[in-house]
Amino acid sequence: MKLILSTLIVFIHTLLVSALPTKEGSDPNSAKKYLVSDLPGLHENITPDNSIPLMFAGQLEIYPETDTHYFFWKFSDSNPETVTNRTIFWLNGGPGCSSMDGALLETGPFRINSQQQVISNNGSWHRMGDIIYVDQPAGTGFSYSDTYITDLDQVAEYFLKFMEKYYELFPEEIGYEIYFAGESYAGQYIPYIADAILQRNKKLVDGEHKYDLRGVLIGNGWVSPNEQSLSYLPFFKDHGLIDVHHPKWATLLAKHEQCQKIVNKIDSTFDDGVVHYYEVSSSTCEAILTDLLEYTQDTASEKDQRCVNMYDYTLRDSYPSCGMNWPYELVNVGPFLRQEKVMHQLNLINLKKWNECNGRVGRTFQARHSIPAVHLLPELAKEIPVMLFNGANDIICNSQGVLSYLQKLQWNGETGFTNKDNQISWIYDNKEVGYIIWERNISFINIYNSSHMVPYDLPDVSRALIDLITGKYDEKDVDGKKSFVTYPLGSRKESDASANGEENAGSDKVPGDSPSQTMDPMISSSTASSSSVESSLSSSTASADSDSTSSKFTRLIQLAVILVIFWGVYVLYASYKSRPSSIIKKPTNNTSNVTRSSAGKKKNVQWADQLNQFEDDERTQEPNQGIIAKAIGKITGSKDTRGRYAPVQRGNGNEYIDDIELGEGLSDPNVDEFIIGSDDDEEQGQAHSGAATHNQKQKPMN
């Protein structure tokens, strides 16, 4: 009988594992080991259940010869009504700063509370498509390697290898439309990766599939470092942070002129295809911001209010932090990701301590042999839409700097925006949230009341950027101004229904330079009609609904089978126990001894990585516990409060020094999470490529 019960438990556990929901067509033998089924606060704080996304995470091996693993965390909407065949790859910057900032502070489905538990972010981008956060280059966040890369060409090479391995795990997604999104120094990463994908698509070999890249979204991007640094002094002056009567004005103006000379030299050789030292080095121009932050201190204010926050000029911070203690919720993210149970739940192979930024990666990644990414934008714009969005309150990668390099750039037959004053109002949820300038497949979007991290400040608004780049908006005249109108999730359909047949209601707008234009270049460079795009999306959604229904029906059948088996075994067991002992076996003088001997034995039941001991099945049962409850208890481990995984040693126990991308100098003197350092040694004052420094402290480009 005990053998039957043991076999039954194994069988039922196998059924339950096989019934786990998977994405359409995914290979359970490869992808399921990356499944994330629990996190602190997940089932307590995220309600209803269909709000919990389907998650996969882990350290994916991309180059075994150098032990290079990229950590990824993927979120998919579990609601079949919103499923789309769309993949969004999100990258943060640095270089060397983790994309977990994006996942847990910006565009992901979760934020982290002070109890280190996940809570809901209602503006999550995973409702617009599968979103994958990747820690790269190797050494960043939870990613690791025996060697670190140094240049942007390598970033593209390594990421394409990651994509190859990713699609081996999820082969059904290889035909999905792809978007890249990120911010700050990702303004260097993303153009290089996108260019490499487009080049790859032009020289496919047998057995390779095209990557359907549809567009890129770069938020407050560090795309043309020296040109953007020229905007610092005008920004401070225009926003009343300094004036021409300031005692240091002449000094600042002289440094501004030095930077201008460098930019003039860059402009004179911009198209020669040569990597010039004066273009890949930006330390002279970046020093302008360092000095501005120092010279504009308000020494009469409280200590924590003396310096302008470089990421949001409306905020103040202590000097020399000047914004590096922000965003304030960042203090919750590190402790959350350093919990051993969380590392196990994220399927880590290497339990490395998570640091927001890795100083060693930043020092190694000098990008001295790669031209700045601004050079790649014209070629990208020939094939895909390029969206550059900016929080209006940011200083370090501000809107003036972005418009400045765009006005010099030649793309698709003309230079800059032909009429940058022709601004289109962006309306979201009946409010004007910014303006758009869009020509020839490049768009600039200035977003009001937001910082360097737009999704952190305005998660719902930022999610609607996906609607803009995919054409899911209405073009209207609002208060006499041309406007693009986007809506909260689901409300566009309601708005269309209330219009009661109004012309163009419910259809995707296809704005362009003329009313007769039939394809929105913001959607793609292909010649497919918008109706075919809608048909494809509708078809994929219907397919997803059908598969979801089939999957639910299958799981119901499996549950019914399990219950029937339980009942049958219970009946057999009850019948067995109710029979006279003489029928079962012949009484002997040593029966009691045998019984006592059997009852004294223990059996070891392995659950996950730990061993728990249970009493023999023939021991006395609790009055209210039946065989079903007992079996379920063994399957679920409900009485075991120690978790599913045994503790893992941390090697020699050495701790790493934190690298926090956006802050240093926490108020708690015992927890300094804002020291710039590395995985190997304690460091302060290291200036990363592409990030200005002040008082020997790094200002990373997240």
Curated annotation (Swiss-Prot):
Reactions catalysed: Preferential release of a C-terminal arginine or lysine residue
Gene Ontology cellular component terms for the protein in this record: membrane; trans-Golgi network
Residues spanning the membrane: 556-576
Signal sequence annotation: 1-19
InterPro entries recorded: AB_hydrolase_fold, Peptidase_S10, Ser_caboxypep_his_AS
The keyword Hydrolase appears for this protein: yes
Residues modified by glycosylation: 85, 122, 441, 449
Location of the region described as Disordered in the Swiss-Prot/TrEMBL record: 491-531, 582-603, 659-702
Membrane topology: Single-pass type I membrane protein
Topological domain ranges for the Lumenal compartment: 20-555
Keyword annotations: Apoptosis, Carboxypeptidase, Glycoprotein, Golgi apparatus, Hydrolase, Membrane, Protease, Signal, Transmembrane, Transmembrane helix
Primary subcellular site in the record, as a coarse category: Golgi
One BP annotation, GO: proteolysis
Polar residues bias spans: 587-598, 692-702
Protein family: Belongs to the peptidase S10 family.
Protein role: Protease with a carboxypeptidase B-like function involved in the C-terminal processing of the lysine and arginine residues from protein precursors. Promotes cell fusion and is involved in the programmed cell death.
Protein name, as recorded: Pheromone-processing carboxypeptidase KEX1
Lineage: Eukaryota, Fungi, Dikarya, Ascomycota, Saccharomycotina
